[in-house]
Amino acid sequence: MRALVTGGAKRLGREMALYLAARGYDVAVHYASSQAAADAVVGEIRALGCKAQALPADLLIEAEMQGLLPAASQALGGPVTCLINNASIFEYDNVETATRNSWDRHMESNLRAPFVLTQGFAAQLPKAQTDVNNEPIAQGLIINMIDQRVRKLTPEFASYTIAKMGLWALTQTTAQGLAPHVRVNAIGPGPTLQGARQSLEHFQKQRKNTVLTRGANPSDITAALGYFIDSPAVTGQLLCVDGGQHLAWQTPDILGIE
């Protein structure tokens, strides 16, 4: 079993890379600029007895997108069987402030790159095998890291949200188009790790303001990944791991607050 995790050097990408290694996967750890962090993750994976390789690529550059999957297959010694499209640009804009540059950056990293990697992944993967019932078992799994925002739209982070909406559509259409050889699913994290530009106070408030009055932990995200790995009959699904954030209903009109 071989996996490629984009944005695998830090945060949830790191957690998923280590989780996959703990389950016996050899892992290619993609990074854009965090080489030291990627090398550290590779060291941890190798300590678990699995192959690992750090692979640099700028996912805003088409040629580097196109080369990443072949590089992962070569580094790990065979076809990649699990692709985690995790790398993402998350920068603020709205309908009034968005520029061509902010639009392109979000679309390239959050939608175009996963599309290109999905194409390459499907092309190098063996066809589905059959089980004891003579029914096909997909040989590949793609997980697209989306966002609970696609379930609860707001006008904030406009380019990012629109790109993630596109990634959700890509998840569903590729689940259709690549079946039965590849399963494609998505995870929508809510407040899990404090953001680089976020104060601790705001992060704690964000977690508390979910339906469950708690956010997710990295282990909740890897548990969702494990569910998809272990569920050969599941494809085209989005699992929001967000404390119910996408179900938030206590708005001022409901609470009687003017």
Question: Which residues fall in each region the model found?
Answer:
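Conserved NAD(P)H cofactor-binding loop of Rossmann-fold oxidoreductase domains
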Residues: N86-Y92, G244
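C-terminal substrate-recognition "lid" of short-chain dehydrogenase/reductases
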Residues: N217-V241, H246-L247
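Conserved Rossmann-fold SDR core element
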Residues: W168, L178-T192, V234-V241
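A short, exposed helix-loop element centered on a Lys and neighboring polar residues
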Residues: T118-Q119, Q172
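Substrate-binding pocket helix/loop in short-chain dehydrogenase/reductase
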Residues: N94-V95, T99-M107, Q206
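Canonical Rossmann dinucleotide-binding motif of NAD(H)/NADP(H)-dependent dehydrogenases/reductases
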Residues: M1-A28
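Catalytic loop of short-chain dehydrogenase/reductase
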Residues: Q129-A179, P191, Q245
